[in-house]
From Swiss-Prot:
Compartment(s): Cytoplasm
A Pfam family annotated for this UniProt entry: tRNA-synt_1
Protein EC: 6.1.1.4
Record family assignment: Belongs to the class-I aminoacyl-tRNA synthetase family.
Enzyme class: ligase
Cystine crosslinks: none
A biological process from GO: leucyl-tRNA aminoacylation
Keyword Cytoplasm appears in the UniProt entry: yes
Name used for this protein in its record: Leucine--tRNA ligase
């Protein structure tokens, strides 16, 4: 048993806090490094192994960077508003504010027990009025610039959470929080106009040091398509509608058009005979998720409206249908159907016996089955016959433009960000409604609009704040007459879309941040968190940064220069941890038994950081044995240094061998840690401790050299085992603190050995290994190999045909 324990942890945590070791000085004249882990929801009662896997290893990386000379800023806070905290409160019967504050206190205690060098003086908590005052300020600034607006729209509704969900919060047709099937509802909601930044959000992705998969996910989510917009007029009316298509070359093959069930045009054009059928169909469509509606394998459904459109080129009548495979949220909510050249249109046309007109043939004239979806040559297209797909796209758009019936168009899959929620635990939207003045933003001087405590927050589908007359009834800031407050609250993703900007200036009461300071401190240099945020938080933060830049508050384009996703720690059974499965890991229990450093080192050694894996009790036990072994070997070295006996001052063979391992380890650990490859870095340190152990068994040792080696080893180990290393550093008689020491630098000359080991093969089989001078030439190596006693014995009575020398590695002697 070693001496390392939680008592050592506590000793050094107190010392670090008392001495202000990690206090950040923004005026320090060295390169800053803003290291940020995604802050956690305080919705449960404590930190789990997943939190630790995010925070512990990244803290080690930040410590490593500090020792390399960077001015590291590593703040911590809590994403305290939103559904998780509110649902926890509903489940336990405790008010969200009370449970959240209690949970934060517990999680702060756990995070401090980790021994991370978080800058707690810069903490932010999103549910505090001091923070959400500025979230409301952000809303007002977006509203002022036309980037926040209110409209009635079909929205995603979770019947279980009793609230609206953004598109990004719907996964496979279900609520990402509770997995309940999502339905559609028409509600008046607040949106942020993220689509105004769609091009830049897409184009700037390739300049980021982000995981390729995350970049691809955002590109797909933004979904830029270059095509054409075509206008169709409705027969016998003044009505018309646009369709977006990437295949305008197939326009002459249109045999019907389809509107989304939610398209408002449907109610205007439906005939009396078809009205009941269309209404019934619209009701059924509300029960289907967007994922289900767009499934290729699902049988197509639809209903005829009784109305017809006029084809813009041919003048022919084409029937207007309603089909749920068309989404109101994509393009214009209407599609031109070309069944000969589109699989979904083909399936729909076959089912409802609609015309199928071929207008594209293969370039080589070969027979092709329908639907033929490739590019080719136009046929049955009048003046456009014989043109290639690309030529026809240009000519047809030119013709449509001359008629005022079409134009080139870029379309995006990205929709505006829906930010209002019918829940209690969120930042109130700073708007009032006045009969005289309409929508009136709350003046900045009246912020924050505080969330009242005494509110019935159990979900019933309405905004809980609407039940509080004291909150709702107010006076109009513009005319002074009675007015009503907005009772929806902001999506918690609004709170987290700008928190990284608040950390460096968290005590500012006059503004959300000082632009001069923030432009010096940001962007964040290293951001670490889960990949599940790819199309939500990470996209929203990019949008808010760009919007604030355009308002003149920021001088940078992107919030997070480099992004890493940590892997997932699974239960011992290899399954995702959950209380219901009974496979959760409590860090507190393991820390109590082994200490925070052993727990941290196991997470860093037992798993590749970006992959994660299944928890193993055997794994943490082996890391504990490793730490105990380090302690024993350093104790032995320290005792020898203290006694000063059998000392020598020369660098002989044993010293050179240890020096080689020392510098080899410095190089490897530096390279691996820089790339967050912590498991291989620790493996190198395990190898080095073997070499150190071997040296301490020498009869005579160079004790000054030994102290230097042990000091270097502790500096390498310090980011991975901060409390243990600080203690050992102190016991070695060094000055406080090891984290004020410089990171060791490797000496390339030390990696060139005086002697190297050469394997000797006879006819491909290894017979012996010998040590030779590293600068020995080929002839010298050959002579040394042939003179070796074991090789003489192995080749006796045989003729040496050939000797092959691979310098520095092996000699192969061919005999017969």
């Amino acid at each position: 048993m070693g001496n390392y324990s939680t008592a050592i942890d506590k000793k050094w945590q107190d010392k670090w806090a008392e001495s202000g070791l990690y206090k950040f000085d923004p005026n320090k004249e060295v390169e800053k490094l803003y290291v940020l882990e995604m802050f956690s929801y305080p919705s449960g009662s404590q930190l789990h192994a997943g939190h630790w896997f995010n925070y512990g290893p990244v803290d080690s990386w930040a410590r490593f960077k500090r020792m390399q000379g960077y001015n590291v800023f590593q703040p911590m806070g809590f994403d305290a508003f939103g559904l998780p905290a509110e649902n926890f409160a509903i489940k336990t019967g405790i008010h969200p504010q009370d449970s959240t504050i209690k949970n934060i206190a517990k999680m702060e205690e756990q995070l401090k027990a980790m021994g991370a060098m978080f800058n707690w003086e810069n903490e932010v908590v999103t549910c505090s009025p001091e923070y959400y005052k500025w979230t409301q300020w952000l809303f007002l600034k977006l509203y002022e610039k036309g980037l926040a607006y209110r409209k009635k729209a079909p929205v995603n509704w979770c019947p279980s959470c009793q609230t609206v969900l953004a598109n990004e919060q719907v996964v496979d047709g279900a609520c990402e929080r509770c997995s309940t099937e999502v339905t559609k509802k028409d509600l008046t909601q607040w949106f942020f106009k993220i689509t105004d930044y769609a091009d830049e959000l897409l184009d700037k992705l390739d300049g980021l040091d982000w995981p390729e998969k995350t970049v691809s996910m955002q590109k797909h989510w933004i979904g830029r398509s270059t095509g054409s917009q075509v206008n169709f007029k409705v027969k016998d009316s003044d009505l018309n509608f646009d369709v977006f298509t990437t295949r305008v070359d197939t326009l002459c093959g249109v045999s019907y058009v389809v509107l989304a069930p939610e398209n408002p045009l449907v109610d205007e054009i439906v005939s009396a005979e078809q009205k009941e059928a269309v209404e019934n169909y619209k009701e059924e469509a509300k029960k289907q998720s967007d994922i289900e509606r767009q499934s290729i394998s699902r049988e197509k459904t639809g209903v005829f409206t009784g109305a017809y459109a006029i084809h813009p080129l041919t003048g022919k009548e084409v029937p207007i249908w309603v089909g749920d495979y068309v989404l109101a949220t994509y393009g214009t909510g209407a599609v031109m159907a070309v069944p000969a050249h589109d699989e979904r249109d083909f399936a729909f046309a076959e089912k409802f016996n609609l015309p199928i007109n071929r207008v594209i043939e293969a370039k080589d004239g070969s027979e092709t089955n329908l639907p033929f979806c490739e590019h080719g040559i136009l046929v049955n297209s009048g003046e456009f016959d014989g043109l290639t797909t690309d030529e026809a796209k240009e000519k047809i758009v030119e013709k449509l433009a001359s008629m005022g019936l079409g134009e080139k168009k870029v379309n995006f899959r990205l929709r505006d960000w829906l930010v209002s929620r019918q829940r209690y635990w969120g930042a109130p939207i700073p708007v009032v409604y006045c009969e005289e003045c309409g929508i009136v933003p709350v003046p900045e001087s009246q912020l924050p609009v505080e969330l009242p405590y005494d509110v019935e927050f159990a979900p019933d589908g309405k905004s809980p704040l609407a039940k509080s007359e004291a909150f709702v009834n107010t006076t109009c800031p513009h005319c002074g007459k009675p007015a009503k407050r907005e009772t929806d609250t902001l999506d918690t993703f609004v709170c987290s879309s700008w928190y990284y900007l608040r950390y460096p200036d968290n005590k500012n009461t006059e503004a959300p941040f000082n632009p001069e300071l923030i432009n010096k401190m940001l962007p964040v240099d290293k951001y670490v968190g889960g990949p599940e945020h790819a199309c939500m938080h990470l996209l929203y933060a990019r949008f808010i940064t760009k919007a604030l830049r355009d308002m003149g508050y920021l001088n940078f384009d992107e919030p997070f220069t480099s992004l890493t996703h940590q892997g997932l720690i699974l239960g011992p059974d290899g399954l995702k941890m959950s209380k219901s499965k009974g496979n959760t890991i409590s860090p507190d229990d393991y820390i109590k038994e082994y200490g925070a450093d052993v727990f941290r080192m196991y997470l860093m050694f037992g798993f590749a950081y970006t992959e994660g894996g299944a928890w193993s009790d055997d794994g943490i036990k082996s890391v504990n044995r490793f730490v105990e072994r380090i302690e024993r070997i350093i104790d032995t070295a320290r005792e020898a240094i203290s006694k000063g006996e059998n000392n020598k001052t020369t660098m002989d063979k044993a010293e050179k061998e240890l020096n080689y391992w020392r510098h080899n380890t410095i190089k490897s650990v530096t390279d691996d840690t820089d790339k967050l490859q912590f498991n291989t870095a620790i493996a190198r340190m395990m190898e080095f401790i073997n070499a150190l152990s071997k040296y301490t068994q020498e009869k005579e040792m160079n004790l000054d050299f030994l102290k230097d080696v042990v000091s270097d080893y502790l500096r390498l180990l310090a980011p991975f085992a901060p409390h243990f290393s600080e203690e050992q550093w102190n016991l070695l008689g060094n000055s406080y603190s090891i984290f004020n020491e410089a990171w060791p630098k490797f000496d390339p000359k030390a990696l060139v050995k005086d002697e190297v080991e050469i394997a000797i093969q006879v006819n491909g089989k290894i017979k012996n290994k010998i040590m030779v001078s590293s600068d020995l030439d080929e002839e010298g190596i050959k002579a040394a190999a042939l003179a070796d006693e074991k090789i003489i014995a192995s080749t006796e009575g045989k003729t040496v045909v050939k000797v092959i020398v691979i310098k520095g590695r092996l000699v192969n002697i061919v005999v017969k």
